[in-house]
Curated annotation (Swiss-Prot):
InterPro entries: Rab-GAP-TBC_dom, Rab-GAP_TBC_sf. Keywords: Cytoplasm. It comes from Kluyveromyces lactis (strain ATCC 8585 / CBS 2359 / DSM 70799 / NBRC 1267 / NRRL Y-1140 / WM37) (Yeast). Belongs to the OCA5 family. It is found in: Cytoplasm. Residues 1-24, 467-491 are annotated as: Disordered. This is Oxidant-induced cell-cycle arrest protein 5. One of its GO terms (cellular component) is cytoplasm. Residues 479-490 have a biased composition (Polar residues).
Length: 530
């Protein structure tokens, strides 16, 4: 006779089920509140608040086709652009550097064939199998979109694979054609023999809310161009290469970003850093391509569409203090003070739900009060020295200036924020990666497991009335990582828990902020020692 499960086991299972149901219900209630808020901000053209909410809470998937164009329209890297050049390259000859120009020398037919090969990898098309008319039309639309970009920017940027994969990633959230909601279903997710799916069927939204959305003023190609300007942004090229390896608050070039990533990775996760660098994940050009997708292409091809969408929410919502724009974009000659209103227009209740301690996630004690680019604070080293001066224990000679009702601006350049998000993802998967063989590590780096399962489930179910327990909540809720201190508590920084538990992208995002503060404090200690 089979044994019956103990009553205590059944009770525990019921408690977990009720806990999961309650947690999902609360999340779905908040998601509905977010949808209403975003629609309100869109109709008021309150793009500053829109950016603040997007980078801290994420954009509901249903609304990305409406929200992303507005975020891009007012993005500083779109208004004052400068992108990584693959036509201008420094050549070092016997310690003498020279900037050389390598224009595109491939024919349009050759480039078109390269695009076709990249598209076939996404759609899993084999040469021996006829391509459906639907896929052929989509491929043509995407190629034309990239061609439009290249015709405009070809002196700076010639074709590389990332351009087509950015277009594919955008098409997973924004329709290729105006006035419909058909988006790409994602790799390996063809839907009813189609590579397209209706966004509002996958992520439902009531008609009365949908009808309130303003018409977008950009077509897909215009959104794509602006997105590339953000993802491929780089500091202006000088006549001589920048030998500095210190680029944190400011943006660095691709090589400097890679150096920063490995520096933070090595300090934060030394036990994991060693096997990953030793076991071949960085050896050989093919094995190291994951770095290109992670850093330059901001998650294209390697992150699931849900996680990549959330990462792009962060990048597109980046907004620094208007008077400090030139600190981050040194080449800029435009004024942003009339574009970005300083006053916070969100209600206090909503603001404290989004910014729980009145900061962006990447905050640091006293950094908000500094006027970067002014008063001798022109380089990252200047800022670090000033932070050290202000944060000495027992230094009562300074009080942090705060302005009431001011938007908490972004303090770290968005591409550096992305690097800390990646380190948080590695930390979340540390135990698993330590047990992996070399081939498994390489597979992980090229196909990062889905993080946003809980978020995705609740955005899909938030307007349903049926059971909301969900299959994505089998684990207990993560322990709170402590309340983040206000900027007046000098250097009393919470580094977060180390339980490797993440139930949503928000957990990873918060952990990334904790890693940033802990690492910045270590940098300051090294500065003091030097």
């Amino acid at each position: 006779m089979p044994l019956k499960p103990s009553s205590s086991h059944s009770e525990r299972k019921n408690r977990l089920h009720l806990h999961a149901s309650s947690r999902n219900a609360k999340q779905q209630e908040w998601n509905r509140e977010l949808v209403t808020l975003f629609i309100k901000l869109l109709n008021e053209n309150d793009h500053a608040s829109l950016a603040l909410v997007a980078r801290n809470a994420g954009v509901p998937p249903q609304l990305r086709p409406a929200v992303w164009p507005t975020l891009l329209k007012y993005h500083p890297m779109v208004i004052s652009p400068n992108i990584m050049s693959n036509t201008l390259v420094f050549k070092d000859d016997e310690n003498e550097a020279e900037l050389r120009y390598f224009p595109e020398d491939r024919s349009e037919e050759d480039i078109s064939e390269l695009m076709e090969n990249d598209l076939n990898k996404y759609f899993q098309v084999r040469n021996s199998v006829p391509v459906s008319a639907e896929i052929q039309e989509i491929k043509s639309l995407l190629k034309e979109c990239v061609w439009q970009f290249l015709r405009k920017w070809n002196k700076i940027c010639k074709y590389e694979s990332g351009l087509i994969w950015i277009a594919l990633g955008l098409a997973e959230w924004c329709p290729l054609k105006n006035n419909d909601d058909l988006v790409l279903a994602g790799r390996k997710h063809h839907h009813h023999n189609s590579c397209l799916r209706h966004l509002y069927e996958e992520y439902p939204i009531p008609d009365e809310l949908l009808n309130q959305l303003p018409d977008t003023e950009f077509d897909f190609a215009a959104i794509y161009e602006r997105l590339v300007l953000v993802l491929f942004h780089a500091p202006a090229l000088d006549e001589k290469p920048d030998k500095s390896n210190y680029h944190l608050l400011k943006s660095g070039n691709l090589n400097q970003q890679s150096q920063l990533f490995f520096k933070v990775f090595a300090k934060t996760l030394p036990e994991l850093y060693q096997p990953i660098t030793d076991e071949g994940a960085l050896q050989g050009s093919k094995k190291a391509t994951w770095l290109y997708w992670w850093i330059k292409c901001c998650g294209c091809r390697v992150l699931h569409r849900q996680d990549r969408g959330r990462v792009w929410d962060v990048l597109l919502g980046w907004r620094p203090r208007p008077e400090s724009i030139n600190y981050y974009l040194e080449y800029n000659h435009k004024s942003f003070e009339s574009i970005y209103p300083p006053e916070l227009k969100l209600s206090s209740e909503i603001f404290h739900k989004i910014c729980k301690c009145e900061h962006d996630e990447f905050w640091f004690p006293d950094l908000m009060s500094l006027r970067l680019g002014q008063n001798g604070l022109n380089q990252d080293e200047d800022v670090i020295r000033e932070l050290i001066r202000r944060n000495k224990y027992g230094d009562d000679g300074h009080t942090t200036e705060t302005q009431e009702n001011e938007i908490p601006y972004s303090l770290l350049n968005p591409h550096a924020e992305l690097l800390f998000i990646y380190v948080a993802i590695m930390q979340h998967n540390e135990f698993k990666l330590l047990e992996f063989e070399e081939t498994e590590i390489t597979e992980f780096l090229n196909n990062v497991p889905l993080i946003s399962k809980f978020d995705d489930y609740n955005f899909k179910k938030m307007y349903e009335d049926d059971d909301i327990s969900g299959s994505s909540t089998d684990t207990d809720e993560s322990n709170a990582s402590g309340i983040r201190p206000s900027s007046s508590n000098h250097m009393m920084i919470e580094v977060g828990t180390d339980d490797k538990t993440a139930h949503s992208f928000d957990d990873i995002y918060q952990q990334a902020g904790d890693i940033w503060r802990n690492w910045a404090w270590q940098e300051m200690e090294e500065f003091i020692e030097e």
